[in-house]
């Protein structure tokens, strides 16, 4: 049986995830929460960039309509 997107997010709570946004930006952090619009709260987040050091951001909120995918 296939899972719904919010079921996957629920299973990923308190676990490390990688989030890719429209425009190609990627963030890695621990998923602390989400809502029905797929707005995400990441703790210990860092922005990942090719050929550059990652930038540590701490706790961030990611707007759901910018999310392309979440990889647990």
From Swiss-Prot:
Disulfides per UniProt: none
Keywords: Ribonucleoprotein
Keyword Ribonucleoprotein: yes
GO cellular component, one term: ribonucleoprotein complex
Pfam family for this entry, one: LSM
GO MF, one annotated term: RNA binding
InterPro entries, sorted: Lsm7/SmG-like (IPR044641), LSM_dom_sf (IPR010920), Sm (IPR047575), Sm_dom_euk/arc (IPR001163), snRNP_Sm-like_arc (IPR022901)
Database matches in SUPFAM superfamilies: Sm-like ribonucleoproteins
SMART domains per record: Sm
Gene3D superfamilies per the UniProt record, alphabetical: 2.30.30.100
Sm domain sequence ranges: 4-72
UniProt keyword annotation of Metal-binding present: no
NCBIfam families according to UniProt: PRK00737.1
Family: Belongs to the snRNP Sm proteins family.
Name the record gives this protein: Putative snRNP Sm-like protein
């Amino acid at each position: 049986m296939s899972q719904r997107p919010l079921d996957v997010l629920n299973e990923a709570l308190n676990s490390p995830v990688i989030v890719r946004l429209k425009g190609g930006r990627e963030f890695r952090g621990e998923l602390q929460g989400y809502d029905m619009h797929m707005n995400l709260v990441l703790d210990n987040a860092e922005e990942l960039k090719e050929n550059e050091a990652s930038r540590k951001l701490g706790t961030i909120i990611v707007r759901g309509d910018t999310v392309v995918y979440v990889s647990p």
